[in-house]
């Protein structure tokens, strides 16, 4: 989930900061990840998913895993490697659903989110291309652009982590103790470092 969606979420940020050292970008994005999940862990008594897994059908962590639950992340890695867009939420969370209504709920939320994002993106794109492209295509970037870009990209990343941490946390106990939290946070943080390197 992290490998697939992080590139979609912060890909333009990474592309426009290719001149920066990889470790600086990793520490920035990884630091935001750590702050975001630590906040959830403190606020929600060990839950790193911002309580997104408290709905019926996902409220208990699995005591054993089925083939589909283990294979889902492997399929996701293969699809990501093939550069195919995929809904990580639907692919991962639906394999843990305990009832058909849970799958329907996940599918409904995913589809409504996609339609909303498509509509909003289309409106913004039309406004930007018609209004701003002619005005700003020939101008030089302001010195304020980079800090504003880092702020907005960091905010987008934090919100993505708040929404999609459930895709990873679905494999974990719903309330992590300190050792489990450090292991989870460290594993993802190091994984982000490998991804950025």
Each language-model region and where it sits:
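Multi-pass alpha-helical transmembrane bundle typical of ion/small-solute transporters
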Residues: 1-197
């Amino acid at each position: 989930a992290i490998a697939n969606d992080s590139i979609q979420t912060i890909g333009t940020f990474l592309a426009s900061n290719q001149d920066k050292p990889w470790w600086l970008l990793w520490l920035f994005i990884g630091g935001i990840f750590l702050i975001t999940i630590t906040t959830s862990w403190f606020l929600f008594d060990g839950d790193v998913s911002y309580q997104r897994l408290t709905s019926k059908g996902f409220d208990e962590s699995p005591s054993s895993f089925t083939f589909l639950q283990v294979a889902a992340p492997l399929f996701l890695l293969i699809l990501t490697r093939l550069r195919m867009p995929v809904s990580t939420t639907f692919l991962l969370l639906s394999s843990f659903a305990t009832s058909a209504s849970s799958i329907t709920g996940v599918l409904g939320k995913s589809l409504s989110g996609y339609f909303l994002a498509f509509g909003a993106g289309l409106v913004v794109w039309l406004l930007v291309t018609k209004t701003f492209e002619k005005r700003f295509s020939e101008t030089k970037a302001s010195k304020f652009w980079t800090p504003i870009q880092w702020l907005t990209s960091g905010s987008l990343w934090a919100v993505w982590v708040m929404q999609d941490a459930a895709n990873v946390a679905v494999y974990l106990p719903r309330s992590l103790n300190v050792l489990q939290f450090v292991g989870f946070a460290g594993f993802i943080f190091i994984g982000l470092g490998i991804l950025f390197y």
